[in-house]
């Protein structure tokens, strides 16, 4: 197979795709991009009008985005029902876990943009606080769910692990690891080869 993906080394959504691909036994060529919410990479825009990563090029000429679509495509390509349960309560629970993790990441990314993109004199503290509250309440819910994660490797646990890794990268000062059950689970999951191979670079 010759799949290619536009990526950014610090994107948690790209990492989710890379982890899913590795767990399913797929390799893909990584195409560097300068994806940015303000100055968009026009090379990416020509194939994904949102100008966002990840954007996947499949063997048969399709262009897929975003991470949720790409991960489900990869699972189907691998025969299905490995990362995404086919039906029933289990499917909806895994999709809800993915949704919570992705929503927490959306809030964390908005916090990051407020810090590094918005001019300092325009910094809006109530906005930043509101996003942090979303992250905090999400972590509380994940802590409650963590005893049920066990050794599962699916779209729910992959999404959650990638979200926690991003908090480590950009917001270590927020101390998410005080959620002890969640932190213990993450230590085990983050040791997986798929997580190690896709690890974010250390911040400059």
Descriptions of predicted regions:
Residues 1-125:
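GST-like domain detector, emphasizing the conserved glutathione-binding G-site
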Residues 1-2, 144, 204:
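Basic/polar N-terminal segments that are highly enriched at the extreme N-terminus
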Residues 34, 202-203:
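Residue-level "edge-of-site" marker
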Residues 59, 161, 201:
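Conserved residues at the C-terminal ends of beta-strands
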Residues 71, 75, 95-98, 139, ...:
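Non-transmembrane alpha-helical segments in soluble domains
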Residues 81-86, 177, 196-201:
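Short, hydrophobic secondary-structure boundary micro-motifs
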Residues 101-187:
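GST-like fold's C-terminal all-alpha helical module
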Residues 184-200:
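Charged phosphate-binding loop/patch that engages nucleotide di/tri-phosphates or the phosphate backbone
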């Amino acid at each position: 197979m010759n799949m290619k993906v536009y990526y950014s080394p610090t994107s948690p959504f790209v990492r989710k795709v890379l982890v899913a691909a590795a767990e399913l036994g797929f390799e893909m060529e990584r195409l560097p991009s300068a994806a940015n919410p303000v100055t968009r990479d026009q090379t990416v825009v020509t194939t994904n009008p949102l100008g966002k990563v990840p954007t996947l090029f499949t063997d048969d000429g399709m262009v897929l985005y975003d991470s949720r679509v790409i991960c489900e495509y990869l699972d189907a390509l691998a025969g299905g029902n490995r990362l995404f349960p086919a039906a029933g309560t289990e499917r909806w629970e895994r999709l809800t876990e993915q949704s919570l993790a992705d929503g927490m990441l959306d809030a964390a990314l908005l916090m990051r943009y407020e810090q590094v993109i918005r001019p300092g004199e325009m910094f809006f503290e109530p906005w930043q606080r509101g996003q942090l509250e979303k992250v905090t309440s999400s972590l509380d819910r994940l802590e409650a769910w963590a005893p049920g994660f066990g050794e599962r490797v699916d779209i729910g646990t992959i999404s959650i692990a990638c979200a926690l890794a991003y908090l480590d990268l950009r917001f270590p000062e927020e101390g998410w690891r005080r959620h002890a059950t969640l932190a213990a689970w993450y230590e085990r999951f983050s040791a997986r080869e798929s997580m190690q191979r896709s690890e974010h670079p250390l911040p400059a």
